[in-house]
């Protein structure tokens, strides 16, 4: 393995600025790793070798001319395949979009291009971002590059599993994912990475193939906190093309890992039945580290942990069923092999063959909760409970600055583990409450499971308090990995 691919974004940037290496050298080193490893992990659906070389050469020309450049100029990256990339196939890992080539670029990927970042390829994912294991992709499951003591192929988490596996296996120093209910944070925990979900509205969703418009948010996976912050600085900021985007300037990170006098809340409801004693001990030891760094640890109550999963899946499935109505077999990726005498027959046949099992399951659920018989009992009730969840967090943040809990109730599980749908959904029990409340949160690796697989801890801050969130995560990282 070439040592170049192990460098952080900051070290790559410094080496590029000093002309010790070129962007093209960085790109070739990462492409070699992809060629050697991607057949095993299946982390990337598409590798854009020639486009990457062209962008690397442009970055090298800018550096050679001594132009003012961004931290990401010339740095390789991987993009989750739900972001529209102009002229580059974008599938959302679904048969329904297997031939879709966008004519426009998403806002966040445009910002990366403008900063000079070099896309190496599109990352595999759960189909339409529906999943927690990255086993529902039309292009096949993604394998976690780590195995620990289990000795079998493990999931990388989902739905941004390809983005996580790519960074963990050194295909790029960072990747762009998306997070609706935990799709960046849970893979970060399973693959030993830092995974940030910003406040809803911090980053534009324009050009992102939606799962649930009111919950989706761009997210970042990296191998350390500083790199994550550097990428967040680039992709954040107001976009008039997205009406839900907050009218804020792009984020500027003021690095300060001094967390003395910070109050950290420990939600008692996260001590759920069946949570392993090993994870509980790791949670307690993480809290003790923060205490030793000067933070005050306070027990808090978040009853919403017990019902947020229900609220999330009702709202998410309802919105997803509405979003997926656009895939009709006429636009995007028509299928000439399907013959039908009526439009209704075409819709039925196309969706039967184009959507996977998990997508169909959520479509049925979403259609039911939006029906005349289910709307009041399910969707309207879930929206009312969502307000209660927001109020609970608001009350807690009057007492503490950040909240600490495990990212997931377990480590990575076998790809062929055959979990039932409800068991799979329980993987998100600690991440969906903050998604429903639309708060910023981050997962940071803090240790290993009994099977030597990574485990992450989850930090949540108040709205638009990403700087505090990153600084607490940085303090924890510095203490754990001196």
From Swiss-Prot:
Gene Ontology biological-process entries: translation
Keywords: ATP-binding, Ligase, Nucleotide-binding, Protein biosynthesis
One Pfam family this sequence matches: Amidase
Top enzyme category: ligase
Active-site residues annotated for this sequence: 80, 159, 183
Sequence similarity: Belongs to the amidase family. GatA subfamily.
Protein name per its UniProtKB record: Glutamyl-tRNA(Gln) amidotransferase subunit A
Subunit structure: Heterotrimer of A, B and C subunits.
Signal peptide: none
UniProt function note: Allows the formation of correctly charged Gln-tRNA(Gln) through the transamidation of misacylated Glu-tRNA(Gln) in organisms which lack glutaminyl-tRNA synthetase. The reaction takes place in the presence of glutamine and ATP through an activated gamma-phospho-Glu-tRNA(Gln).
InterPro entries in UniProt: Amidase, Amidase_CS, Amidase_dom, AS_sf, GatA
Known EC number: 6.3.5.7
Molecular function GO labels: ATP binding; glutaminyl-tRNA synthase (glutamine-hydrolyzing) activity
Reaction equation(s) it catalyzes: L-glutamyl-tRNA(Gln) + L-glutamine + ATP + H2O = L-glutaminyl-tRNA(Gln) + L-glutamate + ADP + phosphate + H(+)
Disulfide bond sites: none
């Amino acid at each position: 393995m070439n040592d170049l691919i192990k460098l952080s974004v900051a070290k790559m940037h410094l080496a590029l600025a000093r002309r010790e290496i070129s962007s093209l050298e960085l790109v070739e080193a990462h492409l070699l790793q992809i060629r050697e490893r991607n057949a095993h992990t299946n982390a990337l659906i598409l590798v854009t070798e020639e486009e990457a070389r062209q962008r690397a050469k442009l970055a090298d020309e800018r550096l050679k001319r001594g132009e003012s450049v961004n931290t990401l100029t010339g740095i390789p990256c991987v993009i989750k395949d739900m972001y529209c990339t102009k002229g580059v196939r974008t599938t959302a890992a679904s048969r329904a979009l297997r031939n879709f080539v966008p004519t426009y670029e998403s806002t966040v990927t445009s910002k990366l291009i403008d900063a000079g970042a070099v896309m190496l390829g599109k990352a595999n994912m759960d189909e339409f971002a529906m999943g927690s294991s990255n086993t529902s992709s039309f292009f096949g499951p993604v394998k976690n590059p780590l195995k620990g003591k289990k000795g079998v192929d493990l999931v990388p988490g989902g739905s941004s599993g390809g983005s996580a596996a790519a960074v963990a296996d050194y295909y790029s120093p960072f990747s762009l994912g998306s997070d609706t209910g935990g799709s960046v944070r849970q893979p970060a925990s399973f693959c030993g990475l830092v995974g940030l979900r910003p406040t809803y509205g911090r980053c534009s969703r324009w050009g992102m193939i939606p799962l649930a418009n009111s919950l989706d948010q761009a997210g970042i996976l990296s191998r350390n906190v500083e790199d994550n912050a550097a990428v967040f600085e680039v992709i954040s900021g107001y976009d008039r093309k997205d009406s839900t985007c907050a009218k804020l300037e792009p984020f500027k990170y003021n690095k300060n890992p001094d967390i003395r006098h910070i109050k950290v809340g420990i939600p008692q409801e996260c001590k759920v039945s069946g949570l392993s004693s090993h994870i509980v001990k790791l949670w307690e030891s993480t809290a003790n580290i923060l205490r030793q760094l000067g933070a005050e640890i306070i027990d808090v109550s978040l009853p919403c942990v017990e019902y947020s999963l229900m609220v999330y899946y009702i709202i998410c499935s309802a919105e997803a069923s509405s979003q997926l109505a656009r895939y009709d077999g006429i636009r995007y990726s028509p299928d000439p092999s399907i013959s039908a005498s009526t439009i209704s027959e075409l819709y039925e046949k196309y969706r039967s063959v184009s959507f996977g099992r998990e997508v169909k399951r959520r479509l049925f659920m979403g259609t039911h909760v939006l029906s005349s018989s289910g709307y009041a009992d399910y969707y309207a009730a879930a929206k009312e409970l969502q307000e209660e969840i927001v109020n609970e967090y608001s009350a807690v943040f009057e007492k503490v600055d950040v909240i600490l809990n495990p990212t997931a109730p377990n480590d990575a599980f076998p790809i062929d583990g055959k979990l039932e749908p409800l068991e799979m959904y329980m993987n998100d029990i600690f991440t969906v409450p903050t998604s429903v409340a639309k708060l910023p949160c981050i997962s940071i690796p803090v240790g290993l499971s009994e099977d030597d697989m990574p485990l992450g801890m989850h930090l949540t801050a108040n709205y638009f308090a990403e700087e505090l969130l990153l600084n607490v995560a940085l303090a924890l990282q510095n203490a754990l990995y001196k």
